[in-house]
Regions:
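The Walker A (P-loop) glycine that initiates the GxxxxGKT/S ATP-binding motif of P-loop NTPases
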Residues: 10
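Conserved Walker
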Residues: 18
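Small-molecule kinase domains that catalyze NTP-dependent phosphoryl transfer to phosphate-bearing small molecules
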Residues: 87, 113-168, 173-175
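Conserved substrate/cofactor phosphate-moiety recognition/catalytic segment
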Residues: 21-66
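Glycine-rich phosphate-binding loop used to anchor ATP phosphates in small-molecule kinases
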Residues: 53-101
Length: 175
C-alpha cells in the first residue's frame, strides 16, 4: 500500500496497536495486522484451523493480502503493525522492519493492565491467564518469534517518542 512499506513487530504488550493508532493520528497509512490480516491458520500452508488447534504459532497473517497491500503504491509509506508467526513468508517485501522492545517490568505492568478480553486462553491452550503471562515472559526473554536483524525500538519511552524513533529510522517526517 505504499511506495515504502514497514513492518512493526514485537511480543505482546510492546505497543504495536498503540503505535499503529498514533501513526494513523499523524496521517500515515497504517494497517493493524492483528485486526485486519490475522487469523488462526497453518503457518506453512495458510489453511485456516478449527478452534481445537489455536496455538500461539498458528496466529498468522494472510500472505496474499500482505502481498496485495504492498503492491498497491497509493501511499508514500505504509506501516504494518502486529504480530505474525509466519512473517518469514513475507518479511522480504518490507523496506524496513522494527521490533518494539520493553523491559520485563514494563511488560508485566502492561500485561496486568490488559482487559480480560484482550486475548484469550486459546493463545497457549486451556491453561489460564497465568500460563499466558509465563508464556509471554518466555517469548520476551528468548525473542524466539520476532524478526531478527530488525531495528530495535525502545517501547518503554512515551508513545510519541516511540513513533518519532520509527519515523526517524524510516527517514520520514509527519505528513
Amino acid at each position: 500500500m505504499g511506495v515504502k512499506n514497514y513492518l512493526i513487530e514485537g511480543v505482546s504488550c510492546t505497543g504495536k496497536t498503540s503505535v499503529c493508532d498514533e501513526l494513523r493520528r499523524r496521517g500515515y497509512h497504517s494497517i493493524n495486522g492483528d485486526r485486519d490480516l490475522a487469523y488462526w491458520g497453518d503457518p506453512k500452508t495458510g489453511e485456516p484451523l478449527d478452534g481445537s488447534a489455536y496455538e500461539h504459532h498458528t496466529w498468522i497473517w494472510d500472505v496474499d493480502k500482505v502481498r496485495a497491500l504492498v503492491a498497491d503504491q497509493s501511499h508514500a509509506a505504509s506501516f504494518f503493525c502486529g504480530g505474525s508467526r509466519n512473517f518469514d513468508r513475507f518479511i522480504d517485501l518490507f523496506d524496513g522492519v522494527f521490533v518494539l522492545e520493553v523491559d520485563l517490568d514494563t511488560l508485566n505492568r502492561r500485561l496486568a493492565a490488559r482487559p480480560e478480553d484482550e486475548w484469550g486462553d486459546h493463545v497457549v491452550g486451556d491453561h489460564g491467564r497465568a500460563s499466558e503471562r509465563e508464556f509471554i515472559a518466555r517469548l520476551h526473554a528468548t525473542k524466539e518469534d520476532i524478526p531478527k536483524n530488525a531495528i530495535t525500538i525502545d517501547a518503554t519511552a512515551p508513545l510519541s517518542r516511540v513513533v518519532d524513533a520509527i519515523l526517524g529510522n524510516a527517514n520520514l517526517v509527519s505528513p
